[in-house]
A protein has these predicted regions:
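Residue-level signal for well-ordered alpha-helical scaffold segments within enzymatic catalytic domains
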Residues: 42-43, 80, 84, 120, ...
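Active-site neighborhood of thiol-dependent amide/isopeptide-bond enzymes
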Residues: 52-117
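Glycine-centered secondary-structure boundary/capping sites
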Residues: 18, 22-27, 80, 145-146, ...
């Protein structure tokens, strides 16, 4: 069973020299399994900043080179680092309501975005149990600034890349538990897949060629600017 959750793929390209160098420098393989998972999780969450890449189908090494990512792309990098360090993992596909992106998406970008946005999280097998990990998507600096800028919110929150029931008490640290940050926005479940390559072969963002071009060359840059503004306030 474990072999299929540890294999390398085009997207989960953990033999890439940059990924191998990172693993060596961080000394993750020298840690116990629990500490290794936590360290990789924290790295992907906080050192790879929240932002929008050119495409969901880019490789883990490209995400690392970009230095930023979102739910799908950061998940690909997370899986590559986990598998390279002998932690079995898989991907779970969904769509989410675009309302949770409002604020990161604004103006014509938000108005023209699909109502349902392709989404995924990573599931790890640790101590014979599967854990659902989603909260690596947003870096803690971004979350802290968002909480400061919405200090009046003490309950549910939806927007700026967040969809949760309790905005003040987020479950974003891994300690043998599931972690979530956008799960309250899920509106369709595609189930689990061995790797993102297989998930994307069956499901992907439904968008016209024109809108895809506009996203790559205009929309995502405006979205990244909005995210930076929040983080730097």
């Amino acid at each position: 069973m474990k072999d299929k959750y540890l294999r390398e793929t085009r997207m989960v390209d953990f033999s890439n020299p940059a990924i191998q160098k990172l693993i060596q420098n961080m000394k993750w393989k020298e840690m116990g399994e629990f500490e290794r998972i936590k360290a990789i999780y924290n790295y992907v969450r906080d050192d790879v900043l929240f932002g929008y890449n050119i495409d969901d189908g880019i490789s883990a090494s490209k995400v690392l080179a970009d230095g930023y990512g979102q739910y799908n792309t950061k998940g690909t990098l997370f899986m590559a680092l986990l598998r390279a360090c002998n932690i079995p993992c898989r991907v779970h596909g969904f769509t989410i309501d675009k309302r949770l992106q409002k604020g990161a998406m604004t103006g014509f970008v938000y108005r023209n975005a699909p109502k349902s946005i392709f989404h995924s999280w990573v599931e790890i097998n640790f101590e014979n149990q599967w854990y659902e990990l989603e909260a690596f998507i947003l870096d803690k600096t971004y979350i802290k600034k968002l909480q400061e800028q919405n200090s009046e919110c003490t309950g549910a929150f939806c927007g700026y890349g967040v969809a949760v029931k309790d905005f003040r008490n987020l479950i974003i640290e891994f300690d043998r538990n599931n972690t979530y940050i956008q799960s309250e926005g899920i509106n369709q479940d595609f189930g689990v897949y061995d790797c993102p390559d297989e998930l994307l072969r069956e499901h992907h963002q439904e968008i016209s060629a024109f809108k895809a071009f506009a996203y790559r060359h205009i929309g995502r840059h405006l979205m990244n600017r909005n995210v930076r503004k929040i983080r730097e306030r």
